[in-house]
A protein has these predicted regions:
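Gly/Pro-rich, tryptophan- and cysteine-flecked surface segments typical
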Residues: 1-203
């Protein structure tokens, strides 16, 4: 982002009963000359926060679809927004993680900034799905308020030899609720197989 706080702001007007789809959102914002987007070239990855100027967001559903080219077309996954007040406050579990020659698991975290501007610090306990034994704890993961972080190939990086497992994400310091999720990708390494993803919500 080409702003001091790495944030771009824009408005959407939605009438009662209206559905609105914003395809290729970054390009759309660029065409609107939204401050912070800049010229085509850089890759954008991050988190979207939605608020209303008056009232509340009851009755409003927000979702996103992330797409990537592959094979003869494109692959993608869809996920819904997490409502204010519904994020995790102390820990979250992610089940069904995989790391094989055909699949890999990325894990992502969002510091919602709902409480204040403090940084959250996390640890991740990784368990073997075959034995139920904790294999390793990844500590000292820091994330500023209203920021997003993805850990690619979590099992390959931190628990080599674990082909299927699960993880507990814990907030060890900080005041803000957080969101944890995983994406199971087709292909043991980036660039292999289709790269198609399956979204895994936390429990």
């Amino acid at each position: 982002m080409e702003t001091s706080d790495d944030t771009a702001n824009f408005q959407v007007t939605l009438q009662a009963g209206e559905q609105k789809i914003l395809p290729k959102i970054v390009n759309a914002l660029r065409q609107q000359a939204v401050t912070g987007i800049g010229a085509a070239g850089p890759t954008f990855a991050g988190v979207l926060f939605a608020t209303v100027s008056t009232g509340d967001m009851s009755g409003i559903v927000i979702g996103a679809r992330t797409l990537a080219p592959g094979g003869w077309g494109q692959y993608g996954l869809f996920y819904n927004a997490v409502p204010y007040g519904s994020a995790s406050t102390s820990s979250a579990w992610l089940f069904g993680l995989q790391q094989t020659t055909e699949t890999r698991s990325n894990v992502a975290l969002v510091n919602t900034g709902e409480t204040d501007a403090s940084t959250d610090v996390f640890s991740i306990d990784i368990y073997s799905g075959g034995t139920g034994v904790k294999v390793v704890t990844v500590e000292g993961i820091t994330l500023g308020a209203r920021r997003w972080l993805q850990i690619n190939s979590l099992l390959a990086q931190h628990a080599p030899g674990v082909s299927q497992g699960y993880a507990q994400v814990k907030r060890t310091s900080g005041n803000n609720p957080f969101i944890a999720y995983a994406v199971i990708n087709d292909g043991g390494q980036p660039g292999e197989r289709s790269g198609d993803g399956a979204f895994v919500t936390s429990a």
